[in-house]
Amino acid sequence: NDGTELLGYARQVVEQADMLEARYEDGGTPQARLAISAQHYAFSVEAFVNVVERCRDSKFEFIMRETTTSHIIDDVRAFRSDIGILYLDDFNARVLQKAFADARASFHPLFDATVHVFVSERHPLARRPQLSLADLTPYTRYSFEQGTSNSFYYAEEPFSYIPCDRNIRISDRGTLTNLLITSNGYTLSTGVLSNEMQWGMASIPLADAPTMHVGYIMHDERKP
């Protein structure tokens, strides 16, 4: 189920963090440091919390930034973050891979996800076993703003290039969750519902959608 999958995905992120933490400890640094920049994925935050829990008896300085795609790349480029968590698909891969190369960073896959539609459990479409893009046309689309790099290729949601008559852009997951629960809008994501989103939410597969390759980027000068 989604809960089991979430734990599996979180463990993969934690393993990467563990390797980074060990590298700092081997170098004789008395305080472990880990900085992560990520798109707005709840499983990333839950994995980060797991890292904090596992290190609670150690000295550490941890940073978790949920931010735009361009800022993730810039943070990794400038060594402000050890890793950056984001996704690739057939639409954005060429452009983002070039941006990674320009930043001297490489993409490492964590898992593949089928695109899902997130809606309120009271949404008219909530009981459907599968949805199409045509089914979503009458409803408001929610997406995360991308700042000055508001290119379709940098969007956190698949199919961002498809026109929509009603769009709401937000910058935090809390607002997104409130909008989804209280209104008949939707967003597209990996389909992994975190604990904070389990209540009042439905996750429905989207037909004929590209695979989301979720992973992390790391500067080429860093070696886990």
Identify the function of each model-found stretch.
Residues R33-Q39, G84, F118, Y142, ...:
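Short, well-ordered beta-strand segments
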Residues N1-D26:
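Alpha-helical "hinge/linker" immediately C-terminal to small N-terminal DNA-binding modules
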Residues A22, T29-D74, K223:
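N-terminal winged-helix
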Residues A99-R141:
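Flexible hinge/capping segments at coil-to-helix
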Residues V95, D102-H108, A113, G174-K223:
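Beta-alpha-beta core module
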Residues S44-N50, A93, L125, P129-I162:
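Secondary-structure junction motif
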Residues R77-S81, Y87, Q146-A202:
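Hydrophobic hinge/microswitch elements
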Residues G3, V76-R77, L136, T177-T182, ...:
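Hydrophobic residues within well-ordered alpha-helices
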